[in-house]
Amino acid sequence: MDWNHYRFRSPWHLPVPPAAVFAVLERPEDYPHWWPQVRSVTWLDDATGILTIRSALPYAMTFTAHERRRDPAAGILEIAMSGDIEGWARWTVTAAGSGTLAVYEQEVDVRKPLLRRLAVPGRAVFRANHRLMMRAGRRGLLRRLRAV
């Protein structure tokens, strides 16, 4: 087992139409306004930006995100990630009943040296930290969608 490799999947059921959810998720520069753990987003060009995230644990991770796919018809937003974490992340936004199912998937390898050193003893804590970040993101997205 590679202790520095992670796969995450977070389904969010949201009581709003898919187009409204997609419109918010496709604007990562606004994430810091509604997702507390996304600390900053700095665009480098139309498809590439640098993000810094930090959840409950006392460390931040910075990575470059490069857009690989933006398909409103399919409800897919996908990025390649490099830096403190390397891999990919994808939102898939679909209709579900009278609302939306937004599924966040991520497969990454941790490259940040401190986290690599703590990979074995810290793995469960790192996964819990990710769950906290995703829970806060869902709450923030709901607030943002209600305000729009």
Predicted features along the sequence, with ranges:
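Glycine-rich portal/gate segments that line the openings of hydrophobic small-molecule binding cavities
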Residues: 32-36, 42-88, 101, 135-148
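Generic structural detector for well-ordered beta-strands
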Residues: 11-15, 42, 66, 92, ...
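Short, aromatic- and cysteine-enriched interfacial helices/patches
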Residues: 3, 57-58, 115
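Short amphipathic alpha-helical segments
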Residues: 17-23, 129, 133, 137
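Residues that form generic nucleotide/phosphate-binding pockets
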Residues: 24, 125, 144
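Hydrophobic ligand-binding cavity/cleft-lining segments
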Residues: 1-46
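Beta-strand/loop substructures that line and gate deep hydrophobic ligand-binding cavities in soluble
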Residues: 81-135
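Short loop segments at secondary-structure junctions
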Residues: 16-18, 71-72, 96-98
